[in-house]
Amino acid sequence: TGGGNYTLDGASITGTAADGSGIAVNGTLTVNNGTVVKGLATGGGNGVTVSGDLVTDSGDGISITGTAFSGDGVKVDGDTTLTNAMLNGRADSGNGVNIAGNLTTDSSTQVSGHAASGTGVNLGAALTGASVKGSSDTGTGVQLADNAVVTEAVLNGSSTSGDGVAVTGSVTLDDTSAAKLNASSTSGTGLKLADNANVSIQTITKVTQEKKDADGNPVLDADGNPETETITTQAPVTTPVTLTGTSEQGSGIATEGNVSISGIVLNGSTTADTGTGVSLGGNLTIADDISGVTAGATGNGTALVVNNASIHSDGYTDSGKDFVINASVSGNGTAIKTQGSSQLDEVVLNGNATGGGTAVELGGQVSGANITGTSDSGTAVRVTDGAGVDGSAVKGHSDSGTGLQVSGNASLNNSDLSGTTQTGTGAAVTGSLTADTSSQVTGSATQDGGTGVTVDGSVTGATVTGDATSGDAV
């Protein structure tokens, strides 16, 4: 269909193919009064392939529906313009909708894609305008692939057990599109920043002014009136935009591999006992001094997991600022949990637990960290079996619980562990702690009835200091 200047007025077109496109719509078309296009690919082809300019000047716009198995339900290929259009694509293992070419739309255009095991909507080009909704059962709702540029659009990605929204390459969003992004999953990851993801946010400014010629003189129309033009500029944001990811049973936000962010605060949360607000893995680079990470959980969930992660706060370091990650939990869960081997130089981790939970649980190998945990009645910092802490400062405070607890076989190197409490125990060693002579363990109780330090296990090498008001110092 297309290839020249044609008009489709209230037409209904259907097509079926195996490995090709059920229908190919291209060229310049005027599509009026609810024109309907439906395409089906029974093999590896695309249901409908769209390229060119499809404009509506009367009545409802075009409705394009494409269905495919391993191909694309609807594929936008090449530079395409749509007005008042509806794109609806479905696929099994392919893409419901694949925006492979630059797509410019108006705000009334809607793009909807669903895939069983594939990707609901895949975006690997420039998108301006449109409301985009992608969903998948076991795959990805919306994928922002390499070279995706999103401007003045609304993105909504959801998945049952996969990723709601996945970023897999270098992606730029304007601040309005980023603020409206919705990423959610039931048991998978709400927002995933995968290997090689590089996300930056731009602010767009439009100014209408009188048009000038090459000599700086006003350009006049046929009636002698000054012509105007709109000048668009873009620049990195100076105030970060919050990207939110939610998951009921999985991770609200997860990073893996090499990831870089600028102009963004990653905000992940979970409400399920088995869920995680934010999971940080791989190499995460904070490229400016305004981006950040916040995490939250309720019940028995975990707000933040740092698992085999190296966090590089280059932008903050260059500005002489501290990079702080805040995580909180309300209930019996954990605010911050470390696993694997993590390098946290120039990073401050703050965990807060209310309702009897644990603020920080240290596991695996942690180096270069500055960690603070606060709990009302639970454990502020727990050092678990097999943990190794190197070149780090760890502080815990619990009002009526335990400020610091070493509960397994752990090791310290050039590190200080301290715990404070009001009426509970400042520091408790119930496991086996091995340390070098430069490491210290201190505990303090500031009110009557509190205990500074209790040792029910063993401490080798470290200096142990306790202080209490009326209870036992050690």
What is the role of each PLM region?
Residues 4-20, 27-45, 52-70, 78-94, ...:
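Beta-strand-rich solenoid/repeat architectures in extracellular/passenger domains
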Residues 24, 166, 254:
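N-acyltransferase acceptor-side catalytic subdomain
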Residues 202-219, 224-240, 468:
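Serine/threonine-rich low-complexity intrinsically disordered regions
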Residues 31, 193-196, 201:
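Long, compositionally biased, intrinsically disordered segments
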